[in-house]
Amino acid sequence: ALKNGADYAFDPLEKDFAKKVIEVSKGGVNTAVEVTGVGAGLNETLDCMAKLGRVALLGCTRISDFTVDYYSKVHFPGISLIGAHTHARAELESSHGNYTHIDDIKAILRLCANNRLTLCDVVKETHQPSECEEVYQRLINDKNFPVGVQFDWKGEW
């Protein structure tokens, strides 16, 4: 994270994680992206938020066997939860806070051009398309599945 431009990096499993985040951010973060799709991850993210903060729910939280204290973690501090499924976005017309797929691609390219993001460091595995079923099963079942897994579509498949 630090190599890709993050100002700080903390282990969410460490004691007092939320307290550390609130301390360095001087009262909590304004924006967070929850990527795990795990209820405990959402709860921990909410614990790190500043008043009127926004949380993008990028992780696919399809398991409903967790609880959130919505009053103290969402309603009282005025937190906005934003569903980040790409099908919910405008296709062509972006507006403040509502960006298109093309807007996201341009933002990623700007981050790369300014050395704030190095995609080569993100890619951990490359597979042939013929391996897609095996890779997908790992994605579903392996809690340690790497973030950067890609398919090589150039070869014969």
Where are these regions (language model features)?
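Short, glycine/polar-rich helix-capping loops at beta-to-alpha or helix-loop-helix junctions
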Residues: 2, 66-70
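C-terminal capping/lid region of NAD(P)-dependent oxidoreductase domains
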Residues: 29-31, 56, 63, 67, ...
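Short glycine-rich, flexible loops that bind phosphorylated cofactors or substrates
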Residues: 40-41, 63-65, 89
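Adenosine-nucleotide cofactor-binding segment
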Residues: 1-44
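Short strand-turn motif at the edge of the Rossmann-like AdoMet-binding core
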Residues: 36, 59-62, 85-87
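C-terminal substrate-binding/catalytic core of Rossmann-like NAD(P)-dependent dehydrogenases/reductases
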Residues: 18, 22, 26, 69-123, ...
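Helix-to-beta-strand junctions that scaffold the AdoMet/dcAdoMet cofactor pocket
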Residues: 49-51
